[in-house]
From Swiss-Prot:
Belongs to the mandelate racemase/muconate lactonizing enzyme family. GalD subfamily. Its cofactor is Mg(2+). Binds 1 Mg(2+) ion per subunit. It catalyses: D-mannonate = 2-dehydro-3-deoxy-D-gluconate + H2O. It comes from Xanthomonas oryzae pv. oryzicola (strain BLS256). Catalyzes the dehydration of D-mannonate. Has no detectable activity with a panel of 70 other acid sugars (in vitro). This is D-mannonate dehydratase. The keyword Transcription regulation does not apply. Gene3D superfamilies: Enolase-like C-terminal domain, Enolase-like, N-terminal domain. Disulfide bonds: none annotated. Transmembrane segments: none annotated. The active site is at residues 176, 229.
Length: 419
């Protein structure tokens, strides 16, 4: 990948040098929509943060532009904690995905600036390396079991040693996670939500057969993961977890809607399949009970939706006390800016488990030059000061915002379900 072009400077001792003089919101669509905040100090150092919220990008962009940017100008970029507290506590209507994604963009941009001022990569600021590379998992999918198995083989050839597997459900026209026409899977595909039809009994029938075949074809040398995408009741999720036990999954993700944390008590009582949840969480309060009661094995929050590095660090520390590991969301609905910051976090955090990783489009990689690299099943962050990702604004301007929304789901009788 091309290297970030932003210049660095020695650590600035003057508060005037650190004064924020500009903060701009950039919305671009190099294959999909991304929202980026770019902050500049008086000394000319810039930092970037991701604020992308899939299907609700302009809501976060407006929140940033109207509520946060005016309050950034004139502040000391080095006072990261104080700025985080100002925006979190100052928002009477606190938490929620829009607020926390906007705060995250500010927070990550400020950490990026701090790394550049110090001349240090972000992982060093956090406390240094805990590992040489972050284990990542890719996404293999197919219209049926055989096609998914072939895709798993292709991902193994690319070097992945952990792979999420999804397959089409017989009798269902469109299944979550299944790409069309050989293109990467992208659920936000139209200006208005598309409707999909779902059958839980059909799904519960095919998934165990999928993993039985994958173990037969690929053995025990790879880690296999699966995402139920919030579609099951607690007892249905418990049944699936039990049925998957012979195939030793790395985890079963988002088995049931996560609003009711106590629902996971039922799942936990019936299966030893490891559980992961949290990509829709926005704060520690969304998962406090899950972690305290050890109802999950992996927490899936993402830096961009959970208030940035400052808050996610607290969440990870809390999880470590209860032997819960990180497994951050990392699909292409987050920009390379978020991936870069997450990778530095993964390199440092002691209770790391795994990192989701989907390949961004060539257009997105060009708009967001970065220094992280994939080798032998792991992502390796670079040594560029900050988080190592920049934005090419001239190139970003060539890709204007395109309205796209996530689908909705109905059961076979027409009842609304959880997509």
């Amino acid at each position: 990948m091309s290297q970030p072009s932003d210049s660095t400077a020695p650590l600035q001792g003057s508060a005037r040098d650190r004064e924020i003089v500009e903060a701009r919101v950039i919305v671009t669509c190099p294959g999909r929509n991304f929202v980026t905040l770019k902050i500049r100090t008086r000394s000319g150092i810039t930092g970037v943060g991701d604020a992308t919220l899939n299907g609700r990008e302009l809501a976060v962009a407006a929140y940033l532009q109207e509520h946060l940017v005016p309050n950034l100008i004139g502040r000391d970029a080095g006072r990261i904690e104080d700025i985080w507290q100002f925006f979190y506590r100052g928002a009477y209507w606190r938490r929620g995905p829009v607020t926390m994604s906007a705060i995250a963009a500010v927070d990550v941009a400020l950490w990026d600036i701090l790394g550049k001022m110090a001349g240090m990569p972000l992982y060093q600021l956090l406390g240094g390396r805990s590992r040489e590379g972050a284990l990542v998992y890719g996404h293999a999918n197919g219209r049926d079991i055989a096609e998914t198995s072939d895709e798993v083989g292709r991902f193994r050839e690319m070097g992945f040693i952990a792979i999420r597997a999804q397959c089409g459900v017989p009798g269902i026209k469109k299944t979550y996670g299944i790409s069309v026409g050989g293109k990467p899977y992208e659920p936000a595909e139209s200006e208005l939500p598309t409707e999909t039809v779902w059958s839980t009994p059909r799904y519960l029938g095919v998934v165990p057969r999928l993993f039985e075949q994958l173990r037969a074809d690929h053995g025990d040398e790879i880690e296999l993961l699966h995402d139920a995408h919030h579609r099951l009741t607690p007892i249905e999720a418990a049944r699936l977890g039990r049925d998957l036990e012979p195939y030793r999954l790395f985890w079963l993700e988002d088995a049931t809607p996560a609003e009711n944390q106590r629902a996971f008590e039922i799942i936990r009582q019936h299966t030893v399949t490891p559980l992961a949840v949290g990509e829709v969480f926005n704060s520690i309060w969304d998962c406090k009970h899950l972690i305290e009661q050890q109802l999950i094995d992996y927490i899936r929050t993402t830096i961009v939706h959970a208030g940035g590095l400052t808050h996610v660090r607290r969440l990870a520390d809390f999880a470590a006390l209860h032997q819960v590991r990180t497994g951050f969301h990392g699909a292409t609905d987050l920009s390379p800016v978020c991936m870069g910051a997450a990778l530095h976090f993964d390199t440092w955090v002691p209770n790391f488990g795994i990192q989701e990783y989907m390949f961004h489009s060539d257009e997105a990689n060009a708009v967001f030059p970065h220094d992280y690299q994939f080798r032998a099943g792991r992502l390796h962050c670079g040594e560029t000061p900050g988080h190592g990702v920049d934005i090419d604004e001239a190139l970003a301007a060539r890709y204007p915002y395109t309205p796209k929304q996530l689908p909705i789901l109905r059961l076979e009788d027409g009842t609304m379900g959880d997509w």
